């Protein structure tokens, strides 16, 4: 329940990403009184970062060493690449944590400003969608890590039951110091590698969930602007007149000035968010085609049914990640361009020349759709189709060499 002074959106604001962010010590927060981050957040971050770095370095190294065996190499490269990208995501958020906290506060101010029931209902709907998508990502990632962790245990139990030779393997193909796989230390190593996978899941569910939530909140902010524009002309009751009076034009200009201020604040926030996410989105998309391609090849080449099930979970999580970035970016661009459509449908032709200039200024800026653009591409649903097509082409090419 929210306090009586809080809007309805407060209960849903970054609900799922906040949980993941707190677990890895990266949720943008400050100590009351303007201080730095809590000490326990630093400890959690150091542990999570160390676990993910060890997994990324060890698994990628294992894949490079075993390039002569494609199946074994791909089994190491798939989770290793994901962890390597997560190392980057964790570092970007840690390095600029104060700036991320400022962005959260700015977005909160934008969404908290409108307390109308209609506006809050719309924002809660978008926030619910964002949280459900974030939960889907967290669930698919957790299922993938559980599959990697349980597969060696199940196979080891089966060998013990039927009295086959062999020992329990580690959950990931990874290069470790020799002492880490000694019988006395092996259980601890297994637990730490499981923790490495869990930290990876919480890391990307936080960062990617933060992105999709931010994008849908920006979409909601642009829709608030659209509602404000409709209300300006609806409150005038100008259906009975052919031309607005001077008083009506003055009222329109006064209220449009407030709309312009909010619109500019949203665009500035979107620009700053894009600047912060540029490296993260770029590296995620550059690695996406490789991850999808290698995962599908793993499923095709692997003869173990358990391994196949594990990589089916993996590809679901990878596709969910990619979809969230494209879905969020697509919503931002469409909602920003919709402001111009709403404004054009209003009775602007009844305004005087001075008021029309204000309307034209908003119209021209809105026609340039705001996007979460990074070098070489913009996250959108067409970009998702392009990446899936590229991954399919890579698979077709590699199959000719197998």
Swiss-Prot record:
InterPro entries linked: 7tm6_olfct_rcpt
Keyword Membrane assigned: yes
GO cellular component, one term: plasma membrane
Membrane topology label: Multi-pass membrane protein
Subcellular localization, as worded in the UniProt entry: Cell membrane
Positions in the Extracellular compartment: 64-73, 156-173, 223-276, 329-402
Other facts: The atypical heteromeric and topological design of the odorant receptors appears to be an insect-specific solution for odor recognition, making the OR/Orco complex an attractive target for the development of highly selective insect repellents to disrupt olfactory-mediated host-seeking behaviors of insect disease vectors. Odor-evoked OR currents are independent of known G-protein-coupled second messenger pathways.
Assembly information from the UniProt record: Interacts with Orco. Complexes exist early in the endomembrane system in olfactory sensory neurons (OSNs), coupling these complexes to the conserved ciliary trafficking pathway.
Function, as annotated: Odorant receptor which mediates acceptance or avoidance behavior, depending on its substrates. The odorant receptor repertoire encodes a large collection of odor stimuli that vary widely in identity, intensity, and duration. May form a complex with Orco to form odorant-sensing units, providing sensitive and prolonged odorant signaling and calcium permeability.
Protein name, per record: Odorant receptor 22c
Organism: Drosophila melanogaster (Fruit fly)
Gene: Or22c
